[in-house]
């Protein structure tokens, strides 16, 4: 890592079972490197739930999602890959080598230790889905006052539960720029009067727009 360059931290879903978020993570990293930044990937290790997350509300969302599948008659896809699971895991771990300089996050009590980078990027995939533990202090970057940018982020739900709305408004309003993956996420954020935060509503930032955001400090 070049110590003379500024550093961008990337917070994303980091599981070894989803091609989409893995490729997005890599793409964001490479875009930032081309812009002359060092990159750090903050890997969220499963730990105790954030105390601010209401588990009852999460359970309601989970049940609602399954009911939607049943009522629509959708088939729930088999989560087991038809190929050899060992080979699949091996391929993911091999690709992880391309996502360099990872810092492992273990505990919310040590969150302030990560407030040492110049820029923070969140996304993609359902990084703000409360069912998956989203809307935590890490995912909302509550611990830093540095520049914050969301790239192709998603809530994975059509409406934020009442218990979460204040939290979403308080912290997402502090982002310098936001792009989201689908229309539902765009609607959620616009309801809290953040239309001026959008750079686009579907895909990653253009390089031109990214340069403007990074250099406006």
Name every feature range the model reports, one short phrase each.
Residues 47-48, 197-200, 210:
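Terminal amphipathic helices with adjacent charged low-complexity linkers/tails
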Residues 127, 184-185:
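Alpha-helix capping/helix-boundary segments
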Residues 6-7, 217:
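Residues that mark the start of a beta-strand
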Residues 175-182:
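A short beta-strand/loop micro-motif in the catalytic core of glycosyltransferases
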Residues 49-51, 158-159, 185-189, 208:
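Short, charged/polar "capping" segments at the starts of alpha-helices
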Residues 7-19, 23-170:
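Aromatic- and Gly/Pro-rich donor/ligand-binding loops
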Residues 158-163, 205-217:
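Acidic anion/phosphate-binding donor-loop and adjacent secondary structure
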Residues 186-205:
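Helix-loop-beta element that forms the nucleotide-linked donor phosphate-binding surface
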